[in-house]
Amino acid sequence: MNAKIIASLAFTSMFSLSTLLSPAHSEEQEKALNFGIISTESQQNLKLQWTPFLQDMEKKLGVKVNAFFAPDYAGIIQGMRFNKVDIAWYGNLSAMEAVDRANGQVFAQTVAADGSPGYWSVLIVNKDSPINNLNDLLAKRKDLTFGNGDPNSTSGFLVPGYYVFAKNNISASDFKRTVNAGHETNALAVANKQVDVATNNTENLDKLKTSAPEKLKELKVIWKSPLIPGDPIVWRKNLSETTKDKIYDFFMNYGKTPEEKAVLERLGWAPFRASSDLQLVPIRQLALFKEMQGVKSNKGLNEQDKLAKTTEIQAQLDDLDRLNNALSAMSSVSKAVQ
């Protein structure tokens, strides 16, 4: 991501808020909406969890709302890029890709059912495994099979990629064998002893309490990441303002009745809260930190090329730091006014 994109984030997010608060334009409302759902679990499980929510959304908006599934996260991003997906539930990393490459815009954020401001990436092994912590894993990695996450997954790929691999100067390729899959597939593979260790997250493990409780009993968590912000809900920027107003109103008011709360609980969430592209700033920093580590450890680059690339990455990190400082200052002023 270049500096111009970073610099425009604050303006874009503030502009989107003013747009939401302005009167609806006279554009024609979309007659149907496709809702993208990332492939964290089997399509069968996702349909069971999401159908009641999408039905409620359809009733409120007065238009058909179709579930849109794809075999991987990239399929949802590409669907939005080519106007086949109108709204989507993403992880933070896939949302970043949708914002940068698919004309997406964050407008809401999930909140965990217990009120937590986010969730955690984890590494799991079978309960019978002699691996009990990260040090054990790092020491024995060349003898282990590893279930990595989807390359566009925040908790399954980016976060462990930085905190487990980049910070310890190792690579996923160090394992005896590495495969990529979604959270549910990885969890079941560990439970069935098909892989030795895999990435996952606390939200998905909670869902296994219902979908596969016996398999959950076979798992052991050996590492837990720092907190990851709640998942973004993203729409296409070029949706009509009339449709955006209705979608925003639905999300900001959903979950107030016992029936709606039950629907959200099935998804592992409490009522949504407003958000913007700015929630992706920490994830952008993480991606850049990981990229920096990769450049520094790349033996195929000479020192001059390394310096040029790291200088460019550092400039982007500096831009993000300034943006964070500005946001903190704005937040302090807002609290003082209140």
Name each region found by the language model:
Residues 30-58, 70, 93, 116, ...:
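Bilobed "Venus flytrap"/periplasmic-binding protein-like clamshell domains
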Residues 59-69, 167-180, 194, 214-218, ...:
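A local structural motif
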Residues 74-88, 101, 119, 183-198:
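Short helices/loops that flank or line small-molecule/ion binding pockets
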Residues 80-81, 137, 190-191, 233, ...:
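Hydrophobic residues within well-ordered alpha-helices
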Residues 89-102, 165-166, 191-192, 196-217, ...:
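A ligand-binding cleft/hinge motif common to bilobed small-molecule-binding domains
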